[in-house]
Swiss-Prot record:
This is Large ribosomal subunit protein bL25. The lineage of its organism: Bacteria, Pseudomonadati, Pseudomonadota, Gammaproteobacteria, Aeromonadales. It holds the Pfam family Ribosomal_L25p. InterPro entries: Rbsml_bL25/Gln-tRNA_synth_N (IPR020056), Ribosomal_bL25/Gln-tRNA_synth (IPR011035), Ribosomal_bL25_long (IPR001021), Ribosomal_bL25_short (IPR020055), Ribosomal_L25_dom (IPR029751), Ribosomal_uL5_bac-type (IPR020930). SUPFAM superfamilies: Ribosomal protein L25-like. Signal peptide: none annotated.
Length: 95
């Protein structure tokens, strides 16, 4: 199974900006690795929740579309809300 996510590069950073994204049903994320600069991203929360129910989401190489370019990544970390069924933040590492 392959996973592809459309992403947007985040312009606003910080706690307040992240909270606004979460209220808008989006997930803040970070993409790093391969000797390149880290990039802050935004993903759709509902698509992430649906995909993370599959075990392959955590073990396979995923595709992120960042500024029209496909980037192969693996999930490095997932932060979840302690009570609600929500993903709070994702870390991706370039594959």
């Amino acid at each position: 199974m392959s996973f592809t996510f459309q992403t947007e590069v985040r312009a606003d950073l910080g706690k307040g900006a992240s909270r606004r994204l979460r209220r808008a049903e989006q997930v803040p994320a970070i993409l790093y690795g391969a000797g390149q600069e880290a990039v802050s991203l935004v993903l759709d929360h509902n698509k992430v929740i649906t995909a993370q129910q599959e075990a392959a989401f955590y073990s396979e190489v995923l595709t992120l579309v960042v500024d029209g370019k496909e980037v192969k990544v693996k999930v490095a970390a997932v932060q979840r809300h302690p009570v609600k069924p929500k993903v709070v933040h994702l870390d991706f590492i370039r594959a």
